[in-house]
Amino acid sequence: MVRMAERLAENFIPEANQRNENEPAYSRYKRVGQNRSRLNSRASLGSSMGRRITLIETDSGVIEVESDKQFLDAFKDANMDAVHHLNAASPVTRGLWCMIIIAFVILVLVQCYSQIKLYISEPVATNIEAEYPSKISFPTVAICNNNQFRLTYLTGGRIMNRRSKSISGSLLSTGHDVESVFDTVLRKSWDMDAVKFLRSAAHWKSRMILGCTWPNGTSCKLSDFKAVWTTTGLCWAINTDPHNPYEVTGSGEGHGLRLLLNVESYERVDACTKHFRTKTLPGLKILIYNQTDIPDSSMNGVNVPSGYSMDIPFKMQHRSKLTGVHCIEENDEQIEASTDFNNPENIRTCTLRRYMTEVENSCHCTLRRAYTSNSTDVKMKACNVDQYFGCAQKAMQRIREEGTASTCLPPCKSIDYTAWQDMNRLPQNLMPALIEEQEEDDEDDVEQEELDENVSFSTVSGGETFSCEDSAYLDDKQVMRIKRDAHRAYEMQARHQEDIFLRSRRLIARLRNAINSIERYKWGWHYDTFSGVADRLSNLTCFSNFSERHRDIISILESRPITSEEKKANQMFFLLDETAFNRNATRYMSVGDLKSRYGDKVDDVAEEIAVILRIMEKLWHVFMPDSYIRTMTGDFSRMDRIIELMNQYELNKLQRRAWAEKMQSRQMKHFFEDDFYESYYQPLIKDLDTTLVKQIDEVEADWPKVEYYLQRGSAGKTGAIMFFGDGNKDNRQKFEKLIVEMHECASGKMRKEAGKMLSSFKKSYRELQAAYGKLFKEELPDYLENFQFGNKFVGDNFAMVNIFLHRMNLEVWSQDRTYGFWSLACDIGGALGLFLGASLLTIIEIVYLCIQYGLCGKRARNMKCIPMDALTRQMKKVATCSCCKKPIEKSREPIYKKKSQSYQRRFTADDEDQGDKFRSRASSEESKRRKNIWAQMNDPSGNSTLTPSEIKNFLDQVQRNSQPPSYHDDHHPEDHYYYNDPNYLTISPPSDRPEDNREGSTSGYYSSPRAPPQANPRDESPIPDTEPISVSEFSDALAPPLFKTPPRERRTRKEQKIDEEDDDKHSYV
């Protein structure tokens, strides 16, 4: 009992000896005031006053101690580890354990936060399984050309010759300029149906797909390819039947779909146009997808450039994702709706329908007819070409930039194909090899080819070719069609592609400007466009009237006979010794005779004569008009034909290829370098350079000697004797005047004018030569190389593709959640157990106790009473009782007969009789002492409090006088304690009961019931509705058990009821 008092003091009494108003109070209650239930263990009872009530039963009676509840009571009652140390006497101990508990609580919170964060992130594990079936369904393969529009269709007669409706207002797709042919195309076709226009402008499968072989070696048919529309253009797909897909039985290159494709790079629109220009590189896109899928764009395909043989291995992955924000689990309705494009339940067409909806909302027209044939339910009109290029393309571009991932989720179960590329060079014998190039003799033999699309075969041969029939990839019909299509495309490129068209136009303009420059400067090859050197020099006064002023001299010079040896000796003799010559003019018959007489003087005279004759001869050629040509006498008809062909090409009357081939004929090819050079350039350059400029330069070189001769007077004498035959003074003066005048004119104005004429002619001819060579020696021959269909053509236009399964296996990818709710609960429970020694059930219990302490008491105030049987079963009755009075029960048989067999062996009827006899032998003195002690319990001030020392003294007295007194007062029966009936309890000392140490006994005191006497029923006050007694507060293995003793008759009724329900229970009320 002392230890129990200490436990009471430890839990309810503060450390300080003096109690203030905030300390918990301990009260004594009358038994009449409240009725309490009894439980065979320590108990904590929640009351309606928000207090904790503890009941202690001793051998002398029952003690009730109550106090205000504290926050730690819930943790203590929930059996959390180390919480009881927070009430330790030492502040150091309390602080240390408080820090430890707080640290562990923080660790628990951190761990719980990390686990909750992990749970919210929804981690997923992906499991990969490999299957090796004997047959695998081959996927759908779609071929998409990066070029969406064919040049030959846009610029062909079907569009350019079409009559469109009148335009009201302005077009959305183009401005008002008419310079670009593609703007003209839009004006010509603005009212056409956009889907029809796009399909006609796309690459045809008959032109793009030249060969196809299934994995089993059989050839494909063009009818096996179906049109597949995407937002980036039209594609051609094979193996599209989802119910009957092609199956392969092996993997590797030998089990692939082999394709020979024509990229048709010559059909690309590289012109500077807003809507038709190809913005991607030349090549193809290969799409590999499941038959149930619908591609929305070709940009995600495998790129195949031209000029290579591509091996494209792929692997299949069956993916099964978890339903969530990334995918949708397809139900039966959605699967059935997969064949209806416009069905909102069709998740496979959601992306395309999103594009179409945006087009319809923005442009008030629809393009659904391209994707589904069932468009009768669409009330909106179809988009025309102007609406497509002016509005629909912009609307689809907005959706492409915004993305559709948030509005259109893919199905969770799908088949993905991962492909890669192996690049190799194309074979050399793809196209027939050219053996001999065709070359016509003259341009008249070259004929134009008919470029109408309805013409099946080419009419012009490009030369003799050779191909091995056993290894030929293309037949003759395909080769001829490719050449014809390429010819037509190259022709359109040359006329409408800015870089080619502008370059050709500028080269033609340059040649025409060179010809115009020659004609402007009167250097042309026609009579009306040519002006000779003499005519040009006649503008000089010193040259124009030279013949009139020196007519007599000119006549003498022109009629001067040839000088003989004798006459030459006489002339030299005259110059050497005029006096001797006058005496005997015929003295010397040869120059040798003169040398024998005059020695070296003969050589000086001979040199002077040679200088005078040379200068006079040169000047004579310079001043004589007959020295220059007056008209061009060559055949320049071919040059005129060249200009005519050039004009025809500019007027679109001559094809570029025909023009180039005509210019490459034998006669045309070498005309400019041979005939034109000899008949035009050589005569003019002779007059200007040889006759005029060079002669004047040579005269200037020898003129210093002539000037020396003039100064000493021998020049006039020599000239007079050489040209006039008489060396008199007049002849001398005429000659000197003539040679000086001719030199002054030639070295002055004539020389300057001759330099200008020569420079002008050379410049004009060089420009003509450069322009002619650039156009006819470079541009057109390069253009003709396209029609050789050799390695350059093959590398620019062809590609080979082999699509095959990399390994004969399937990868099945499935996703599972790796961290669910139960994993979170287990981790949080583990963290609680590791750091706090608690569990989730402990947390729930703490919450429950907190609610019980704070809320249940308030609810209990509204209850009138709780039957005693409910309290006995530790249950709280929610419904209130109208009356707690119960009828008197019948006497029951001895309890030992209702107990188990072991109980009956320990307790018999003799034991009950012996107890009755013992109770009747109580002494009066001891009864008085007990009355004095227990009188304190009957104090009218039942709520008076006791100090801890008073409680200790009181408990010591109770222990010494544990038997309660007997009261017999018939006048005040309401003040009797219901347990003061001396006939009810029998107290046996421990020494008389050897069975006290038996199994199941918890104390040296026990209560032995006997059959109750017949008594009248008495009224009982209502029992307050209290909480069930919790077995959780004061447990001590060495302390006596705690009992709560009710009145005998109520105890008998309750024990009988409990015995009937469970014979193994030892606690009763």
UniProtKB/Swiss-Prot annotation:
One of its GO terms (cellular component) is plasma membrane. The gene is del-10. Residues 938-948 have a biased composition (Polar residues). Keywords: Glycoprotein, Ion channel, Ion transport, Membrane, Sodium, Sodium channel, Sodium transport, Transmembrane, Transmembrane helix, Transport. Belongs to the amiloride-sensitive sodium channel (TC 1.A.6) family. PANTHER family: AMILORIDE-SENSITIVE SODIUM CHANNEL-RELATED (PTHR11690), DEGENERIN-LIKE PROTEIN DEL-10 (PTHR11690:SF296). It is found in: Membrane. One of its GO terms (biological process) is sodium ion transmembrane transport. It is a multi-pass membrane protein. Gene3D superfamilies: Acid-sensing ion channels like domains, YojJ-like. Residues 898-948, 960-1069 are annotated as: Disordered. Residues 117-830 are extracellular. Coiled coil: none annotated. Residues 915-928, 967-978 have a biased composition (Basic and acidic residues). Pfam families: ASC. Residues 1-95, 852-1069 are cytoplasmic. This is Degenerin-like protein del-10. The chain crosses the membrane at residues 96-116, 831-851. Glycans are attached at residues 216, 290, 374, 454, 539, 545, 584. Its main location: membrane.
